[in-house]
Amino acid sequence: MTNIRKTHPLIKIVNHSFIDLPTPSNISAWWNFGSLLGLCLIIQILTGLFLAMHYTSDTMTAFSSVTHICRDVNYGWLIRYMHANGASMFFICLYLHVGRGLYYGSYIYFETWNIGIVLLFAIMATAFMGYVLPWGQMSFWGATVITNLLSAIPYIGTSLVEWIWGGFSVDKATLTRFFAFHFILPFIVAALVMVHLLFLHETGSNNPSGLISDSDKIPFHPYFTIKDILGVLFLTLTLMTLVLFSPDLLGDPDNYTPANPLSTPPHIKPEWYFLFAYAILRSIPNKLGGVLALVFSILILMLSPILHTSKQRSMMFRPLSQCLFWILAADLFTLTWIGGQPVEHPFIIIGQTASILYFSIILIILPLVSSLENKLLKW
């Protein structure tokens, strides 16, 4: 009798995706982040669902409802901090996942890559709206500043901002719609993840060498399910250590003050995972220019397949490109640091230099160095 997992219409899909999936035998731990992102999404949806049962999206009660969750709901503090720090773990895994894709040339599968970038935008939008919900000082002012950026769009900007706000400032209407979108977006993200996997399984996984690995593939289960469990243990350990020992480490103290439209915090800044983009935004003195730079700092990833000039897919055998990649990584750390600093000397010039370097490496230097490596290979 044929095994049910190979014949049943539903189980067959799971089988082809996670059990009998032919996987390159040499993929490293950098390929663990896909499954970890799936785990993060599940954690976020489950904790978010339980938080939504007790949260009220009204400006008068939002802040106190979060306080009520932490004080009065059974393990409410645990659910709240798992959700808040789970977002941080989500973005750590996301950035490492994208970095892996850039390093090993995974962007050559451009449908998978582009859907991944759409996913990145969707998750960023979800996280931004989630940060507004506790209705603390940084929630309110962060929402005001970031939504106000849309007013830089010529002609329709001001009307667009007021339409998003649902009034003439960030208020009850804004909070209610942000809660609605924050609730629905993770499910849209889950659907996009399915499409992401669909396209990935059309081509099969890339591997560290960047070479075709059809002749050397092994089943996903048990080899990589076991390998993924190690990543799951590390992720769970890190998340729970953060939640149980220092839950506010990555948060902002200003968000423990209820939102007050009459008092502006001295330094308005988003969560740490948006600081690199925020630094790029602030480094351009023109409002519209800053907004465009902010959008293109992520959108530029879509150009990776076009800008690939090397004859080799992966950076594994390209030492010059490797150096550039790690300079880019250091540059992103610098931008993250600058995004959290006040707008004054020397931070302004450091931010501007780091922003120029970020775009230069991706658009100009990396393609040129890749071409040079092609020439060196012929010698």
UniProtKB/Swiss-Prot annotation:
One of its GO terms (biological process) is mitochondrial electron transport, ubiquinol to cytochrome c. Heme b b566 binds at residues 97, 196. It is a multi-pass membrane protein. Heme b b562 binds at residues 83, 182. GO terms for cellular component: mitochondrial inner membrane; respiratory chain complex III. It is found in: Mitochondrion inner membrane. Binds 2 heme b groups non-covalently. PROSITE patterns: CYTB_CTER, CYTB_NTER. A ubiquinone binds at residue 201. Its cofactor is heme b. The chain crosses the membrane at residues 33-53, 77-98, 113-133, 178-198, 226-246, 288-308, 320-340, 347-367. Pfam families: Cytochrom_B_C (PF00032), Cytochrome_B (PF00033). Keywords: Electron transport, Heme, Iron, Membrane, Metal-binding, Mitochondrion, Mitochondrion inner membrane, Respiratory chain, Transmembrane, Transmembrane helix, Transport, Ubiquinone. The cytochrome bc1 complex contains 11 subunits: 3 respiratory subunits (MT-CYB, CYC1 and UQCRFS1), 2 core proteins (UQCRC1 and UQCRC2) and 6 low-molecular weight proteins (UQCRH/QCR6, UQCRB/QCR7, UQCRQ/QCR8, UQCR10/QCR9, UQCR11/QCR10 and a cleavage product of UQCRFS1). This cytochrome bc1 complex then forms a dimer. Heme 1 (or BL or b562) is low-potential and absorbs at about 562 nm, and heme 2 (or BH or b566) is high-potential and absorbs at about 566 nm. Component of the ubiquinol-cytochrome c reductase complex (complex III or cytochrome b-c1 complex) that is part of the mitochondrial respiratory chain. The b-c1 complex mediates electron transfer from ubiquinol to cytochrome c. Contributes to the generation of a proton gradient across the mitochondrial membrane that is then used for ATP synthesis. Belongs to the cytochrome b family. This is Cytochrome b.
